[in-house]
């Protein structure tokens, strides 16, 4: 029986309320199904930790991440007014901790399943199922290289992409497409590269590398789309897509559009992979005004726990771990289909604890 070492890193804001709920979902899946063991290590980092200690993260965190199989993390950054007056305002610490947990430890590829769970209502007309997968380049692109202001009348940012990072990005997209069942429309396995090719040299370079990579995946089609057209088609006809691949900033935008049509930020999970320790986290931010008030949505954290177990289980060829992820997902869907508790952001009136407990009870009822 395999044992998995998982770092639990709530970081800032509402993460301290909801990330332990995701950890509890994983532990409950283990208790119900067996077949795998979990060793959970709770650690601290982020803006609030910096305000209290003067350090961005606890001593030994890099070493703990190096020994871990994955981490379940919250969001970094806290923009409380009083905190902004301190020596550690959110914009100074939040961004570095986020970048450290991504490119700082080599997690240069972002994954976001855009899946509409059963029981959730899609805002798109006549759409009741969505299953698209977004792969985003995290280690390069517009967000990575520091820009600067030029005098009082101009500013400059730099967009740089390299062959090595782009090959890793493309390889991840094609590998995921090969492992999926294809697009819902007709089962064809495909990668759609969305950017502004023909306008920006870096994006033409993306086309070149993706075309080269596609030769090693004859079973996966490669398509190109201008990102504005891609956004339109994602809203009109999401079934035409299987795997979508985008540059960092473009992927950020497309990912949030995808979150909107699959239940919102309070539902969607995301992951950063490829480095020392893969990071799994809810798509939402720190939401500081909800901290400790028992009205934050716990479902994204629970969904993220399911994604962690499924992804690591797939990488390690461990069906027991993947079954744990499936159990959590089925329990989420059971709650939604049976009109169970929903938090205010979903149109309900239930609190964080009651919503989470409903899913935990459902885990005891559903079968795989």
Regions found by a protein language model. Give the residues of each.
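Active-site rim loops that border cofactor/substrate pockets in soluble metabolic enzymes
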Residues: 42-50, 203-244, 248-253, 280
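N-terminal beta-loop-helix "entrance" segment that forms/cooperates
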Residues: 35-59
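Glycine-rich phosphate/nucleotide-binding loop
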Residues: 49, 234-338
């Amino acid at each position: 029986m395999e044992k998995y070492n998982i770092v639990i890193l709530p970081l800032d804001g509402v993460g301290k309320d909801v990330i332990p709920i995701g950890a509890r979902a994983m532990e409950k899946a283990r208790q119900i199904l067996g077949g795998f063991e979990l060793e959970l290590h709770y650690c601290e980092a982020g803006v609030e930790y910096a305000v209290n200690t003067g350090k961005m993260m606890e001593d030994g965190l890099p070493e703990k991440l190096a020994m871990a199989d994955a981490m379940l993390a919250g969001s970094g950054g806290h923009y409380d007014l009083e905190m902004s007056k301190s020596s550690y305002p959110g914009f100074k610490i939040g961004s570095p901790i986020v970048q450290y947990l991504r490119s700082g430890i080599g997690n240069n590829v972002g994954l976001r399943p855009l899946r509409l769970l059963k029981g959730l209502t899609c805002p798109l007309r006549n759409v009741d199922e969505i299953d698209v997968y977004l792969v985003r380049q995290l280690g390069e692109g517009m967000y990575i290289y520091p820009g600067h202001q030029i005098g009082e009348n101009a500013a400059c940012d730099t967009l740089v992409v390299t062959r090595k990072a782009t090959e890793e990005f493309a390889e991840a997209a094609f590998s995921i497409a090969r492992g999926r069942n294809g697009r819902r429309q007709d089962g064809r396995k495909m990668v759609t590269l969305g950017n502004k090719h023909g306008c920006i040299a870096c994006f033409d370079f993306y086309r070149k590398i993706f075309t080269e990579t596609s030769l090693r995946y004859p079973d996966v089609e490669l398509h190109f789309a201008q990102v504005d057209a891609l956004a339109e088609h994602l809203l009109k006809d999401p079934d035409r897509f299987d795997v979508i691949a985008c540059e960092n900033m473009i992927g950020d935008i497309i990912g949030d559009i995808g979150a909107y049509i699959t239940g919102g930020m309070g539902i969607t999970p995301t992951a950063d992979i490829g480095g020392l320790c893969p990071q799994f986290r809810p798509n939402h931010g720190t939401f500081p005004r909800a901290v400790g008030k028992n009205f934050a949505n716990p479902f994204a954290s629970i969904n993220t726990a399911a994604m962690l177990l499924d992804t690591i289980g797939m990488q390690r060829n461990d069906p027991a771990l993947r079954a744990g992820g499936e159990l959590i997902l089925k329990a989420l869907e059971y709650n939604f289909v049976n009109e169970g508790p929903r938090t205010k952001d979903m149109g309900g009136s239930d609190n964080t604890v009651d919503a989470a407990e409903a899913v935990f009870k459902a885990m005891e009822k559903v079968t795989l």
